[in-house]
């Protein structure tokens, strides 16, 4: 399956993930303007810190995510609880994995009310097979800061281990706090 021709929708018991839409911007602004959620956002290698307070900023960001999907750079799903956007998940493949299959990077940004172990326990088993299979990645990296206790615990429950040493940005800059899941 080519995720850039047909983006998979992922449904769990309480959540749905689907390709981000422009109409999501208003709901996502509540996520990206949440000061309790902002410390958990991963902006490594990004042109923004994802801390938005105005709708035009969020619309511009969503437009960039959609453009990036259309050009095959990454998939950005909106995470919905019912009809309400409560976060996003992003996945892309880096072709510098040690086994030649590439390495995926998974970002998960959630409103602070959803930054809970039980939410990750629902998201990760649904997302990880797609990340490995549809992106062709032998391993998936995700960032989790030392203060993100429930996220860290959930990563451990779902087979993630701390990445050995620093991960390198595209320009070689070392970045820390990554966890790895192997297929």
PLM segments and residue spans:
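Conserved acetyl-CoA pyrophosphate-binding loop and the N-cap/start of the following alpha-helix
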Residues: 114, 118-127
């Amino acid at each position: 399956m080519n995720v850039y021709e047909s983006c998979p929708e992922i449904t769990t018991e309480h959540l749905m993930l689907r390709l981000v839409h422009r109409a999501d911007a208003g709901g996502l602004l509540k996520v990206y303007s949440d000061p309790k959620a902002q410390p958990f956002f991963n902006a490594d290698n990004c042109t923004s810190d994802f801390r938005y307070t105005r709708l035009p900023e969020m619309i511009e960001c969503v437009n960039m995510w959609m453009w990036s999907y259309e050009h095959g750079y990454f998939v950005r799903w909106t995470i919905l609880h019912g009809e309400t956007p409560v976060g996003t998940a992003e996945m892309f493949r880096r072709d510098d994995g040690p086994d030649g299959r590439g390495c995926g990077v998974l970002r998960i940004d959630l409103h602070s009310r959803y930054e809970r172990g039980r939410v990750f326990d629902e998201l990760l088993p649904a997302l990880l097979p797609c990340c490995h299979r549809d992106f062709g990645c032998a391993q998936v990296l995700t960032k989790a800061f030392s203060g993100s206790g429930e996220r860290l615990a959930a990563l451990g429950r779902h087979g993630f281990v701390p990445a050995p040493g620093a991960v390198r940005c595209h320009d070689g800059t070392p970045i820390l706090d990554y966890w790895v899941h192997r297929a």
